[in-house]
């Protein structure tokens, strides 16, 4: 059995948690998040706590038991505090701008890259080289951040590209001329 799964998740005062047909809905000041779990895990809400129990003794049920608890704990944290990821753009002429519900990236290509901002995500751009992705859904914040970074990952020779703040880019030496 999972030691993580045995611990209940406590619900803060300003958060509402409900379960319907294996789907957990968490609503709080920062937004609303929902996640559907496999029928191998039973999720119950009682007196300001969410508890988890495997419905069968299979290996899959034991694995999902702790995973479900961790995901719901992350959902509660997301709707109370929120998640943020900061990106940094390095390179001559590389910049980012917000145009309505789209993020406009100029990354050295012949065309601008327009990224539609998904529902539940807030993007802020400061001085055209710093992008902050915020939201209540941890998975969605990470996915949007990875998508932005994927347009031009940092390259090892000059170091230009889109990187997550704090990410260490391994630098390489260029060709040596004899």
From Swiss-Prot:
The keyword Ribonucleoprotein applies. One of its GO terms (molecular function) is rRNA binding. One of its GO terms (biological process) is cytoplasmic translation. The keyword rRNA-binding applies. InterPro entries: Ribosomal_uL6-like, Ribosomal_uL6-like_a/b-dom_sf, Ribosomal_uL6_a/b-dom, Ribosomal_uL6_bac-type, Ribosomal_uL6_CS. GO terms for cellular component: cytosolic large ribosomal subunit. It holds the Pfam family Ribosomal_L6. It comes from the Bacteria. Keywords: Ribonucleoprotein, Ribosomal protein, RNA-binding, rRNA-binding. Part of the 50S ribosomal subunit. HAMAP family: Ribosomal_uL6_B. This protein binds to the 23S rRNA, and is important in its secondary structure. It is located near the subunit interface in the base of the L7/L12 stalk, and near the tRNA binding site of the peptidyltransferase center. Belongs to the universal ribosomal protein uL6 family. NCBIfam families: L6_bact. This is Large ribosomal subunit protein uL6. It comes from Opitutus terrae (strain DSM 11246 / JCM 15787 / PB90-1).
């Amino acid at each position: 059995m999972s030691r993580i799964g045995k611990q209940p998740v406590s619900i803060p005062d300003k958060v509402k948690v409900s379960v319907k047909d294996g789907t957990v809905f968490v609503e709080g000041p920062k937004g609303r998040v929902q996640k559907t779990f496999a029928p191998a895990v039973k999720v119950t809400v009682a007196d300001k706590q969410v508890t988890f129990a495997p419905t069968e003794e299979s290996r899959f049920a034991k694995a999902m038991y702790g995973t479900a608890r961790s995901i719901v704990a992350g959902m509660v944290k997301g709707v109370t505090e929120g998640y943020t990821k900061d990106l940094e753009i390095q390179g001559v002429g590389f910049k980012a701008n917000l145009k309505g519900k789209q993020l406009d990236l100029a990354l050295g290509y012949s065309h601008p890259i327009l990224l539609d901002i998904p529902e539940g995500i807030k993007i802020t751009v400061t001085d055209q080289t710093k992008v902050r992705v915020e939201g209540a859904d941890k998975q969605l914040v990470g996915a949007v951040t990875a998508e932005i970074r994927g347009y031009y990952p940092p390259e090892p020779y000059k170091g230009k590209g889109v990187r997550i703040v704090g990410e260490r880019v391994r630098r390489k030496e260029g060709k040596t001329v004899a």
